UniProtKB/Swiss-Prot annotation:
Family (UniProt): Belongs to the thioester dehydratase family. FabZ subfamily.
Pfam families in the cross-refs: FabA (PF07977)
Entry-linked SUPFAM superfamilies: Thioesterase/thiol ester dehydrase-isomerase
UniProt name for this protein: 3-hydroxyacyl-[acyl-carrier-protein] dehydratase FabZ
GO molecular function per UniProt: (3R)-hydroxyacyl-[acyl-carrier-protein] dehydratase activity
Active site: H53
Cellular location(s): Cytoplasm
EC number: 4.2.1.59
Top-level taxon in the UniProt lineage: Bacteria
Enzyme category, top tier: lyase
Keyword annotations: Cytoplasm, Lipid A biosynthesis, Lipid biosynthesis, Lipid metabolism, Lyase
Catalytic activity: a (3R)-hydroxyacyl-[ACP] = a (2E)-enoyl-[ACP] + H2O
Amino acid sequence: MSDNHTLHIEEILDLLPHRYPFLLVDRVLDFEEGKFLRAVKNVSFNEPFFQGHFPGKPIFPGVLILEAMAQATGILAFRSVGKLEPNELYYFAAIDGARFKRPVVPGDQMILEVEFIKERRGVARCRGVAKVDGEIACEAEMMCARRREV
């Protein structure tokens, strides 16, 4: 881990099982274990889903904004709750109160902010927000569950 509470892509790849095209966290800008995490997703026109969402009016799919926030939640959980066993993962378990406030388009830099609320019996609850240029694009509460791989 970097000394200044950032995580580069190599460190993110060590924590998350996701790979292209579903790795949606490019870098962790700051975090404090058990408290919060701030990450970035650079939105490129080269993302494969922009071909169909929507032709002539590309918009980052809302469900993928939530997935990016969930991945940030997973990273925070990995860093906060302790080392997982080799056959364990954090699974996206629930989402509550999701709200979309503005579209995210190619060229945007999406800042993902997640705040740890609590952990009980292997289930972590976090509050998340995705922002572009300081404006909220999406907000939700998410849970991820620590489970053995199936």
